[in-house]
């Protein structure tokens, strides 16, 4: 029998499709109905920005704040030095402290678009677990914390078991990650009264570890809530495109390309993505998602505009839509297309189309460039390119050259 929560937050989670599992739905619902519940999600600083795969959990934090609770974004300045083994096929490379700090700075810019970090009962907090992990005494930690963990139980977690079943190495360093993440929850409860940890369903084992530890050490009533691991209707992992990660940083991915990612959503995913990634009413999401034929394209544009507005602002969303119309409907050039610069010295007397595409970073290899040309997938200023060895010169580029790769990827190349 489905439980129907009375608290606004859990009702939104259930209605919009954010909810996979909860350790004690009724008790959490009761707590959230009575007052402000601080809740956190942890983010290891393994990249210079977050990507679309993180966006579902960021939206959960946004809804948490909108429904009267306190979101905590926990930066893994400490745990990133160890690495999360969850469902990894191999050990992560270790990062320097300087690189970790730089990554955290990039991630902060993204969170500030979605959460209000001002003072107040529901003002968001941004914390770094290096605050308590960097100063730990190892022997004290083993005695006071390590004794509460069963290695047998930790080996049964699917994230660990899958590595061992493939006979792949799981280092002691990574194995300790689970204990450190559990300790985060204990410290957040002790220092900030945090009572809820959220995350993707692959984090269930880590979340339960933290709950068990906090109950044993501090006898705290705390909870865990997970979201589904999202894939598209055709089975692709959310957050990836043919060109790689879909970054949430405007410096790593142009707002136009971000907008275009959402515009290219598969028909079957439109309604679901509107519920998860926008704040439109559920009824409107259902109506738009049910459209068919040519009408579904309007729903995709609405999705792209709403998601891009949340991250980059209304002006960027409108510019992206205008550029898309110019590029696709009129065959022109829009102002929001990403600009790629190439030095005249690189071109010399002229580069072949193949070498030009690689030098400009438009493809990853000469083989890919030749395949594009062979499959009629390359156009310069809307004209098909049929010879992969034809020269590209500075004079040919002129003020700018519009390069179209396939039907959906367009760049402007200018001389540096």
UniProtKB/Swiss-Prot annotation:
It is found in: Cytoplasm. GO terms for molecular function: ATP binding; RNA binding; tyrosine-tRNA ligase activity. It catalyses: tRNA(Tyr) + L-tyrosine + ATP = L-tyrosyl-tRNA(Tyr) + AMP + diphosphate + H(+). Pfam families: tRNA-synt_1b (PF00579). InterPro entries: aa-tRNA-synth_Ic, Rossmann-like_a/b/a_fold, S4_RNA-bd_sf, Tyr-tRNA-ligase, Tyr-tRNA-ligase_bac-type, Tyr-tRNA-ligase_bac_1. L-tyrosine binds at residues 40, 177, 181. The keyword Phosphoprotein does not apply. A motif ('KMSKS' region) lies at residues 237-241. One of its GO terms (biological process) is tyrosyl-tRNA aminoacylation. GO terms for cellular component: cytosol. Residues 351-416 form the S4 RNA-binding domain. ATP binds at residue 240. Its EC number is 6.1.1.1. It comes from the Bacteria. Catalyzes the attachment of tyrosine to tRNA(Tyr) in a two-step reaction: tyrosine is first activated by ATP to form Tyr-AMP and then transferred to the acceptor end of tRNA(Tyr). This is Tyrosine--tRNA ligase. It comes from Cereibacter sphaeroides (strain ATCC 17025 / ATH 2.4.3) (Rhodobacter sphaeroides). The gene is tyrS.
